[in-house]
Amino acid sequence: MSFFDYSNQYDYPIFFEECKVPQQTKIFRELINKYHSYVKYSDVPQRRINYLIYRTSDSKVIGAIGISSCVLAISVRDNYIGWDKETRLKNSNMVANNYRFCLAPDNGIKNVGTMALKLLRIEGGKRWKEKYGDDLVMLETFVQPFRDDSDNKRNGAVYLADNWSMVGKTKGTSIKKAPVSLWQREDSTRGELSRKDPEAAIKKYAVGREHYVVTKSPIKKVFLKPLNKKWKRMLNA
């Protein structure tokens, strides 16, 4: 049973409102850019559900939280779940990435971070099924810490408080779609291209009609939160 009986959301200090119109998305973007200290908002074509977080007492927006398609492949997560490539490609739509989460400081609500994560599991899981037709079985998130882990906002403390598991760290690379200028050339010119554009220096490849580059990125902690007791069986079916 959930920590919340969500039959009446207004019994609780916070509530969510999904971003469905441009004005809500604008507020979401502004909150992320203001309070999310190291990753700004960007639009990427993928599954995505964004929420504004309101304080119930005065209906004031105090934060933003969102889920999106999970990361294509990451070894520590895939090993934790037990995925091989084929199973991952088949079942990855049952995992969502808590890709952004921020709260305004001095919001006046104790433990608001863990409250928001619990509501995300309720609202996000229900909406994921309604919108995309897949059961949401697990959440993932990535936290880029300070070198000495001195700042709780940057070491994943709120996820640990909500009983997420820190399963490892990323390798410091990421995959993104390649600019047209990178893939319109022949493979034989890759050496010259790499010298001109660092984004092509690690690797580039194609999947169907889509072209990607593997680039360097900051190393991040990987946190996972199963949403179903049978998560391992469901994600490996």
Predicted features and spans:
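Short, basic/aromatic recognition patches
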Residues: T25-I49
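Polar low-complexity intrinsically disordered regions
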Residues: M1-F3, I32, S150
